[in-house]
Every structure is written in structure tokens, then in C-alpha cells.
Regions:
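N-terminal secretory signal peptides
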Residues: 1-27, 39-40
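N-terminal twin-arginine translocation
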Residues: 22-30, 38-60
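Early extracytoplasmic/lumenal segment of secretory-pathway proteins
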Residues: 62-144
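A structural signal for short loop-to-beta-strand junctions that line the ligand-binding cleft
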Residues: 64, 132-139, 157-197
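Ligand-binding pocket segment of bilobal, Venus flytrap-like solute-binding proteins
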Residues: 148, 224-227, 232-235, 244-312
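A bilobed periplasmic-binding-protein/Venus flytrap-type ligand-binding module shared by bacterial periplasmic
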Residues: 196-203, 237-242, 319-334, 350-353
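Mature extracytoplasmic/periplasmic domains
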Residues: 326-401
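Conserved C-terminal helix/tail region of periplasmic/extracytoplasmic solute-binding proteins
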Residues: 391-431
């Protein structure tokens, strides 16, 4: 634990976060859009499948992760997705990584190297296909087609389950044994969130709490609704009562029919890859599909009291960004030590207070409440109120009943599935 370490005041770190230009991290993730599949995933998978030089059967996690950690870890993550602050000279640094290095003597080269899953995946392709070190010891990839490709083609190491005691003790139930990675064989969650409904209460004409409200001009007006291209198919199926994980072309067409009905109703302003949050805060959208952390940030930390994020009555899409160790990584022992370090509640809370997404460590709630009370005792009332609001938000600390109303969405594992999916859904958002 790093509770005894000399850490910066959380008010300083987070107030600095408030002043930054808030990029939509999930928007960055989606930025390349579905069209990025043109990287040639199908051919890529076929090429990998023929390369049996690095078969998972030959991977011995005990051997891979059993040595002494090296003195440097290369960590590829998304922009603005970790705790940042500034020193007295104005230089930006990451307190949690500074503390890790003090404790272990291991230097961490943290790079905001990932702008989208498909783009980053494509950059790694030559080294992965050749069985070479990618230069990264930890990468962060979202559950979905690229995560599935990395695992199925044995391009990430299976983890040693004896090397993550903090994960075993503190990880949320939803973070353990996820359907897309049974028994966490290859991954540990970094952060997570939900896709639901963001609303501007100044513009809606009645409660917008279910999907059909977003197709009703009497509630949302005309030309004032945003939809997210990548999440839309799964999200619509969930809200039609369809289980996307077991869905097929018939269900996909049912979802597409609803989307066409919504488009024909004249409510759509734009189908977004990213940037929806700018239009929501600017008053250009009355309602939009939205990622939970984005609206929470603007409402809680930036004073947009007119915004709300609603969990749809029909359910929400649950996405998870996952830490993985690429095959042939130079320092797997160091990588898994750092991955497990982030499952200490104090460390995880430092990240949560900065990024405001769903933490895989539920005990961060108590830590943040303690920080809020400490800030309140020091008369940092505005700051303490924000921390209280963060810790008490049910969408950052969901109960089992809420999680039961979510789905990870459809895993598309074959070229035929991907092609049919795209043929059904792409014309709607691109038409």
C-alpha cells in the first residue's frame, strides 16, 4: 500500500484536471469508427492462424511471469486516463506511477499511445505476426473484436493467476471472470463504464429515460438527438429486449428497423464517432447516447447542472478497457506487478478521482468518501462536495441489480459475422 507516501493534495490534482480541456476518452477510442476495420482484420487473423510458432500451448505462465522484474516497464494507454498532477515547477507527472517506482525501483515509461483500438491494433500487427516484441509490456484494449482477435490468435500472454493477489482480493465481481475473457485468463480491467442517455434538461420536453423517447419529437425535438455509431447496434438490441450476445441476423435486422424508424422521425442531428459531448454542452443536442464518465465529469466537476446521464429503462451497454501483456513482451514480471498494484484501493482511488469512470475496485468508494470528509474538514467545501457526488454516484458504483440490466454486447468472431453486421448497420449511420 502507498498510504504512507508523500502524495499531492487531491484538491490540487483534481482542480488541475477540471481546468484542462476535457477530451472524450471514449470518443478517442471510437474515433477511427467502424471503417477502421479496413485495416484488414480478416486477412490479418488468417495470417496469424497459420503462424503456430507461438502457440498458447507452449506458453507457461509460471515461467513467463516467474522471473525477476526488469528495471523498466513500457505501458501504452489512452490519453487522459490516469492520475495526473503538476509539481511546484509546473511539470506534469503521474503520482501513482511515481509511488510505484519509489516502492519497487522500476521505472515506468507511460505513453498515451492509443487513440483507437483498430489504429493501435494495426500498428502492432507487423511485430505480433512476426512473433516479435512490440515494445510494450502492458497495453489497454476494449472488449470487442480487437480484444477477441488478440486472444484468439495467441498474441497476448495468459496471466499467472498466482501473481495478482490485490486483484483477487479487491476486484469487483463484474471484473472477475468476464464472459469475453473467462477466468481473466489474459486480462485485468483498467477502467470501465456504461453507454446510456445524456440529456440537456433545458431542451428536452419531458423525461427521456427510455430508448423510444429518443425517437419521439414531442420529447426531444427535431434534429437534436445524437447516436453513437459503434455502440448503437448492441445498445438498440438491449433496449428492444434482445440479448445481443446470442443475437443473429434476424435480431440485427430488427434493431436496424428501429434505427430507421428513428431516423425517419427527423430527430437525428448526427451519428457520432466522437464529439457528442461538445454538442451536448453547447446546447446543440437535447438527448444523446452518452458514456457515463463524460456526463458525470461535466455535471459534477464543471458545473453543467442542466445535464443528466440516465440509465435507460431497457438496459445499458457495459464496456471494459483491459490491461493485457503482449506476447514476447520484455518485462512480463514487471507488467503483472504493476497491473496488480493498481488494484490497491488507495491507488485505484487516485485514478478514479481523476478519470471519473467506473473503477474495477469497489473499495475506492470508501477511500473517496474519506477524502471528501478530509476536504470538508479543511473547508474545501466545493471540492468535498464534488468528491461526495463522485463517490455516491450509482453509475460509478453499480449494484448487482443495475449490472444485471447491462450487456457486454455481441462478440463478432468470424469474417462472415462481421461482414453481415456491417452490411446491416453501416448504411443507417452513413446514409
Amino acid at each position: 500500500m502507498n498510504e504512507g507516501m508523500d502524495r499531492p493534495h487531491r484538491d490540487e490534482a483534481l482542480m488541475d484536471a477540471m481546468m484542462r480541456a476535457r477530451l472524450t476518452r471514449r470518443g478517442l477510442l471510437k474515433g477511427a469508427g467502424r471503417g477502421a476495420a479496413a485495416l484488414g482484420l480478416g486477412a490479418f487473423l488468417a495470417a496469424c492462424a497459420s503462424n503456430d510458432e507461438t502457440s498458447e500451448a507452449a506458453f507457461d505462465p509460471k515461467q513467463i511471469f516467474g522471473g525477476q522484474p526488469g528495471d523498466k516497464i513500457n505501458f501504452a494507454n489512452w490519453p487522459l486516463y490516469i492520475d495526473y498532477t503538476k509539481d511546484k515547477d509546473g511539470n506534469r507527472y503521474i503520482p501513482s506511477l511515481r509511488d510505484f517506482s519509489k516502492q519497487t525501483g522500476i521505472d515506468v515509461n507511460f505513453q498515451e499511445a492509443i487513440q483507437s483500438n483498430p489504429e493501435f491494433f494495426g500498428k502492432l500487427q507487423p511485430q505480433l505476426q512476426a512473433g516479435q516484441d512490440t515494445g510494450w509490456d502492458i497495453i489497454v484494449i476494449t472488449n470487442g473484436r480487437y480484444f477477441t482477435a488478440l486472444v484468439e490468435n495467441e498474441w497476448v500472454y495468459p496471466l499467472d493467476p498466482t501473481k495478482h493477489p490485490n486483484f483477487d482480493q479487491y476486484a469487483a465481481k463484474w471484473a472477475k471472470d468476464p464472459t469475453y475473457d473467462p477466468n481473466n485468463k489474459h486480462s485485468m480491467a483498467w477502467q470501465s463504464g456504461f453507454t446510456g442517455i445524456g440529456v440537456n434538461n433545458d431542451l428536452i420536453k419531458g423525461p427521456v429515460t427510455k430508448m423510444d423517447d429518443m425517437a419521439n419529437p414531442d420529447k426531444v425535438g427535431t434534429g437534436l438527438v445524437g447516436m453513437l455509431k459503434e455502440d448503437m447496434p448492441d445498445w438498440v438490441m438491449i433496449n428492444l429486449g434482445i440479448d445481443p450476445t446470442t443475437s443473429g441476423p434476424a435480431e440485427w435486422k430488427e434493431a436496424a428497423a428501429w434505427m430507421l424508424k428513428q431516423r425517419d422521425a427527423g430527430v437525428i442531428r448526427q451519428y457520432y464517432d466522437q464529439g457528442y459531448i461538445d454538442d451536448l454542452t453547447a446546447g446543440n443536442l437535447s438527448a444523446t447516447m452518452a458514456w457515463s464518465g463524460d456526463v458525470l465529469y461535466y455535471k459534477t466537476w464543471s458545473g453543467y447542472d442542466n445535464l443528466d446521464w440516465n440509465f435507460p429503462e431497457g438496459g445499458a451497454l457495459h464496456w471494459v478497457d483491459n490491461m493485457l501483456v503482449p506476447a514476447e513482451a520484455a518485462n512480463p514480471a514487471g507488467a503483472i506487478e504493476l497491473m496488480d498494484y493498481y488494484y490497491q484501493p488507495r491507488v485505484a482511488a487516485d485514478v478514479t478521482e481523476w478519470v471519473l469512470y467506473l473503477s474495477p475496485v469497489p473499495d475506492t468508494q470508501d477511500v473517496i468518501l474519506k477524502d471528501a470528509k478530509a476536504a470538508e474538514a479543511q473547508n474545501y467545501k466545493g471540492y468535498s462536495n464534488k468528491l461526495f457526488a463522485t463517490a455516491e454516484n450509482p453509475f460509478m458504483y453499480p449494484d448487482d441489480a443495475l449490472l444485471a440490466r447491462t450487456s457486454y454486447g455481441r462478440e463478432l468472431k468470424t469474417d462472415d459475422e462481421r461482414e453481415e453486421w456491417d452490411a446491416i448497420f453501416l448504411p443507417i449511420s452513413q446514409g
